[in-house]
């Protein structure tokens, strides 16, 4: 159905595990599809809250077909440039996670939520050697599959913030640069001074600029393939009332992905980082908002990848 979150209209989908374990039969698949189509017609964001468990198929092949049906509905929503946000509670497994939920533009999860196609109990029953297999939201964010982990009592506040960013009601107009600005003399520094400044460990990094230039910054994580490269920061924020997508290269002394052969740590960009930036660009196109990038990097990470 439809509702308001802080005066912002949205279509709401709620999957409750108390009803047949949150599985997706013909009726559930039809209702989800109709809700996604309603969001497309009304041109308002769609928010889905999921609590499902198990891989059971209530009606055999007809139930299985709902995965494709709902996935096509999400694709149609994306083609119309309508945001789709999903909240994963504990647990979120089975058909729903493996179909439309994992195709969302922004995925938020509760802490320690059990996530995956099969439940951890089913996996350990099939393979006794995988009892310690990480199957939680913390693992999924590390491997780039979800955007944010938020406590339940703070989800509404974050949703309201995100919806405000995705409801751009103000557009910054282009202006002509004045002649007095074009004639301004900027301080000259020779190349040696510039190189020394760039290597100064105490100079401002990307996060400093994000905190001091933009407001309501909502960071998104992961490349949706394999990892979340921390050398690339992506997210949505506001500047002068205009929502923008931000891609910032965080040159730092730490690189969680790897260490150099000398033992020092640096912030080279991995293939995951490039995929993460590409995803942010695609989201900017989807949400119809400008893109702002901060370039500050020692270069790409050299390796087999």
Predicted regions and their residues:
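Cleft-lining beta-strand/loop regions that shape enzyme active-site pockets
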Residues: 4-78, 85, 235, 242-305
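Structural signal for hydrophobic packing residues in well-ordered secondary-structure cores
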Residues: 36, 40, 74, 78, ...
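Catalytic cores of large soluble enzymes that bind and process phosphate-bearing ligands
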Residues: 24, 62, 132, 147, ...
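Intrinsically disordered, low-complexity segments enriched in small/flexible residues
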Residues: 1-4, 156-244, 248-253, 265-266
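Residue-level recognition of alpha-helix initiation/capping sites
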Residues: 30, 91-92, 131-132, 228, ...
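Conserved catalytic cores of soluble enzyme domains
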Residues: 53-172, 288-291, 295-305
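Charged, alpha-helix-enriched surfaces in structured cytosolic catalytic cores
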Residues: 27, 65, 95, 102, ...
């Amino acid at each position: 159905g439809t509702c308001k979150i802080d005066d912002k209209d949205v279509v709401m989908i709620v999957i409750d595990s108390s009803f047949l374990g949150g599985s997706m039969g013909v009726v559930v698949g039809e209702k989800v599809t109709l809700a996604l189509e309603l969001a497309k017609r009304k041109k308002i964001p769609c928010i889905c809250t999921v609590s499902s468990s198990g891989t059971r198929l209530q009606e055999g092949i007809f139930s299985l077909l709902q995965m494709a049906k709902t996935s096509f509905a999400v694709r149609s929503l994306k083609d119309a440039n309508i945001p789709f946000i999903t909240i994963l509670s504990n647990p979120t497994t089975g058909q729903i996670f493996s179909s439309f939920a994992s195709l969302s533009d922004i995925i938020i999860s509760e802490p320690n939520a059990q996530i995956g196609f099969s439940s951890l109990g089913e996996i350990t029953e099939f393979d006794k050697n995988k009892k310690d297999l990480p199957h939680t939201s913390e693992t999924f964010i590390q491997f780039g599959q979800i955007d944010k982990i938020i406590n339940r009592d703070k989800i509404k506040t974050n949703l309201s913030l995100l919806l405000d960013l995705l409801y751009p009601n103000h557009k910054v107009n282009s202006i002509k640069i004045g002649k007095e600005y074009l004639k301004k003399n900027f301080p000259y520094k020779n190349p040696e001074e510039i190189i020394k400044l760039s290597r100064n460990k105490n100079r401002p990094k990307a996060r400093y600029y994000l905190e001091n230039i933009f407001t309501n910054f909502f960071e998104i994580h992961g490349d949706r393939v394999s990892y979340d490269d921390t050398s690339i920061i992506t997210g949505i924020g506001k500047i002068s009332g205009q929502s923008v997508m931000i891609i910032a290269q965080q040159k730092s002394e730490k690189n969680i992905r790897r260490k150099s052969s000398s033992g020092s740590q640096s912030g080279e960009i991995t293939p995951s980082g490039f995929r993460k930036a590409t995803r942010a660009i695609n989201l900017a196109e989807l949400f119809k908002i400008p893109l702002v990038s901060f370039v500050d990097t020692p270069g790409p990470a050299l390796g087999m990848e």
